[in-house]
């Protein structure tokens, strides 16, 4: 098919779906950069504490996001098959699952907060540990609100509404920055102030998204939340997609924790440098990640409509878009690296290491990132989640984690070892996913009636 009018999604539809997602991700990362710069003025120990705790927080956030994405894929396929009733039933179960799971995780983290931090980051300096405990206390309370927002935002995107999550996120991020300014600088609360501001902004997101989904003019309308009861068949379908993706994301974060534990032995300067580099690397990937998130909605609806050739077409099309986004983003972020380290008040040694790592990323990321991620987004939307989980976990542990630990502990490399391992992981994973995509075996799954 070469005529764009023959496709389920026109170029205009794609732009309307992707641009808000890309802008939302970009602004969130920019706000994260500003957030870190604000915290960095408190001191290197504060930056290190936020970085260490966020490696745990992101583990939880990624797991919750994967479950929500599983529900969104289910909703997308129901919408593609012209079954809005099924989409609405699935959406209600997504909210139920996310609420129960996020509250449970928050409670566990609250009870095990101190021993967990000491077990993972026991070798850090006392000041960093104290700041970490204060920061984690407030951020763990936000997990249920993250779960509710993720559920709502994913459901909105499943019905082609990516503008609403973007708007909510924009307002939330500015509230977070404003809260930081008041609590960190005005009241001198340090990392605790940053955490409280984050908690408040996430509560805002959850409340607004719940209200927004009550609109009966939408394809999916979720109201009377108190009447939601378990539908075990739908819950199993949500978890069929969500659990493998959650394990994949969680294993990825466990790997980052293992790496972070190794980096934490290199000293506060290395921890701070790697923390800022992580933010910059995330920033140069947000546009392409937005393409991947939108691709799940597109492929999900194609599969639901029984148009598998369309799914293949869109994965190829959006992979090219993601590659262009990666190249441009890497160049822009590299140009901003030195100004950010200066404005953030980083120590000279940390700034030097940060610049070197960002240069390495700018060279290597455009080579391998797209093939290792974008086709996988589409294949997961078709239900091919177990293969993605196995491939990603094996590659991450065998390449990323092993290389980093080997280079740091045996050969005496600094934090640059993290990114050498990352490049190896991306390369291997990209090769495997490319073979899987061209085999078309990922099209043989059925997750809706």
Spans of model-derived segments:
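Short runs within selected transmembrane alpha-helices of multi-pass transporters and secretion channels
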Residues: 68, 138-157, 165-173, 194-209, ...
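Short alpha-helical transmembrane segments in multi-pass integral membrane proteins
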Residues: 1-21, 75-142, 186-243, 299-365, ...
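Helix-terminus/linker motif at the lipid-water interface of multi-pass membrane proteins
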Residues: 26, 30-48, 117-126, 182-189, ...
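N-terminal transmembrane alpha-helices
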Residues: 5-37, 41-42, 58-70, 74, ...
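Residue-level hotspots within the lipid-embedded alpha helices of multi-pass solute transporters
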Residues: 25-29, 62, 102, 106, ...
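Small-residue hotspots at the loop-to-helix junctions and early N-terminal turns
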Residues: 44-55, 132, 136, 195, ...
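Transmembrane helical elements of multi-pass membrane transporters/channels
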Residues: 16-35, 138, 172, 201-205, ...
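Small-residue-rich hydrophobic transmembrane alpha-helices
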Residues: 47-107, 146-165, 271-337, 369-393
């Amino acid at each position: 098919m070469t005529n764009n009018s023959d496709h389920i999604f026109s170029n205009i539809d794609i732009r309307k779906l992707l641009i808000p997602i890309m802008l939302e991700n970009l602004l969130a990362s920019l706000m994260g950069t500003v957030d870190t710069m604000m915290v960095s003025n408190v001191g290197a120990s504060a930056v290190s504490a936020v970085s260490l705790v966020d490696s745990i927080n992101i583990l939880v956030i990624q797991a919750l996001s994967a479950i929500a994405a599983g529900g969104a894929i289910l909703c997308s396929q129901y919408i593609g098959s012209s079954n809005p009733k099924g989409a609405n039933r699935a959406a209600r179960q997504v909210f139920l699952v996310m609420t129960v799971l996020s509250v449970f995780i928050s409670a566990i983290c609250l009870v095990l907060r101190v021993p967990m931090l000491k077990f993972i980051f026991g070798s850090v300096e006392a000041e960093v540990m104290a700041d970490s405990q204060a920061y984690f206390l407030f951020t763990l309370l936000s997990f249920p609100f993250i779960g509710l927002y993720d559920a709502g935002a994913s459901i909105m995107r499943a019905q082609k509404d990516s503008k609403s999550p973007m708007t909510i996120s924009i307002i939330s991020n500015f509230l977070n920055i404003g809260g930081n300014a008041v609590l960190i600088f005005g009241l001198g609360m340090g990392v605790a102030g940053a955490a409280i501001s984050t908690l408040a902004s996430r509560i805002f997101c959850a409340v607004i998204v719940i209200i927004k989904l009550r609109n009966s003019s939408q394809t999916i309308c979720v109201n009377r939340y108190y009447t939601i009861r378990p539908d075990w068949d739908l819950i199993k379908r949500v978890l069929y997609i969500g659990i493998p993706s959650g394990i994949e994301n969680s294993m990825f974060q466990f790997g980052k924790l293992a790496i972070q534990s190794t980096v934490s032995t290199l000293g506060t300067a290395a921890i701070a440098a790697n923390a800022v580099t992580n933010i910059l690397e995330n920033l140069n990937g947000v546009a392409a990640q937005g393409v991947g998130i939108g691709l799940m909605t597109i492929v999900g609806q194609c599969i639901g409509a029984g148009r598998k050739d369309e799914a293949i077409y869109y994965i190829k099309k959006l992979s090219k878009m993601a590659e262009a986004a990666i190249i441009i983003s890497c160049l822009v972020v590299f140009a901003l690296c030195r100004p950010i380290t200066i404005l953030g008040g980083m120590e000279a040694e940390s700034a030097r290491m940060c610049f070197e790592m960002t240069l390495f990323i700018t060279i290597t990321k455009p080579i391998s990132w797209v093939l290792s991620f974008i086709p996988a987004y589409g294949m997961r939307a078709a239900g091919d989640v177990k293969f993605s989980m196995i491939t990603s976990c094996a590659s991450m542990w065998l390449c990323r984690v092993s290389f980093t630990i080997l280079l740091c502990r045996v050969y005496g490399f600094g934090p640059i070892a993290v990114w050498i391992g990352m490049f190896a992981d991306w390369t291997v994973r990209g090769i495997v996913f490319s073979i899987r995509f061209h085999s078309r075996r990922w099209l043989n799954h059925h997750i809706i009636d």
